[in-house]
C-alpha cells in the first residue's frame, strides 16, 4: 500500500497503437468529429429489427402493418412517456459505443506499461457499468470507490460472486 497513482483513465475513443485521441491529434477520429454515435445508431437498428420481426409475424396492429418502417421507428422512439420504447432497456445498451470508459482505459493503460494493478483500489466518479466491472474483477482490483450510483449497471447481478457493496463482506470476495 504505497498510496501512489498506478494509472489514469478517461472516457474517450481509443486509437490504433494504444491510448486515446486527444485535442490536436492529427486524423482525430473521435465521434464528435465523425458526427454520429454508433451506439445510438445500433439502438435504433435493434428497435427496427424487433419491429420488423413483429410486423413480419403479423403481431403489429393493422394500422402499423403498412406504415413506412423509418417513419414507424421515428414515431415509436419519439414517445418519451414512461411506457415508451425510448425508456426501455434496449435503449440502455452501451456495448456498441466506441468510447472506452475511464475504468477500462486505466486498466489497459496500466497493462500497456506493465504496471500490476492487482490488489489495488480504483477511484471513479460513477459506479462501474457491467462491462467495466468484468474487467475490474479480472484485473484483480480489490476495491472500487465511487461517488455517483449508476442504476443501469448489471455489475452486481452479473458478478455477485466477486462484487459486494457491503464493506463488512469486502474481505470475503
Stretches found by the model and what they are:
Residues 1-173:
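Zinc-dependent deaminase catalytic domain
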Amino acid at each position: 500500500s504505497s498510496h501512489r497513482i498506478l494509472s489514469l483513465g478517461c472516457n474517450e475513443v481509443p486509437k490504433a497503437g494504444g491510448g486515446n485521441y486527444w485535442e490536436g491529434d492529427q486524423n482525430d477520429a473521435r465521434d464528435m468529429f465523425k458526427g454520429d454515435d454508433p451506439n445510438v445508431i445500433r439502438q435504433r437498428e435493434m428497435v427496427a429489427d424487433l419491429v420488423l420481426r413483429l410486423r413480419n409475424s403479423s403481431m403489429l396492429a393493422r394500422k402499423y402493418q403498412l406504415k413506412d418502417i423509418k417513419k414507424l421507428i421515428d414515431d415509436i422512439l419519439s414517445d418519451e412517456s414512461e411506457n415508451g420504447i425510448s425508456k426501455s432497456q434496449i435503449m440502455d445498451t452501451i456495448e456498441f459505443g466506441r468510447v472506452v470508459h475511464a475504468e477500462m482505459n486505466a486498466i489497459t493503460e496500466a497493462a500497456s506499461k506493465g504496471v500490476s494493478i492487482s490488489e489495488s483500489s480504483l477511484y471513479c466518479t460513477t459506479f462501474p457499468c457491467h462491462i467495466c466491472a468484468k474487467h475490474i474483477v479480472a484485473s484483480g482490483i480489490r476495491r472500487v470507490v465511487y461517488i455517483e450510483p449508476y442504476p443501469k449497471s448489471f455489475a452486481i447481478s452479473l458478478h455477485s460472486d466477486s462484487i459486494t457493496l457491503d464493506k463488512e463482506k469486502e474481505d470475503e470476495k
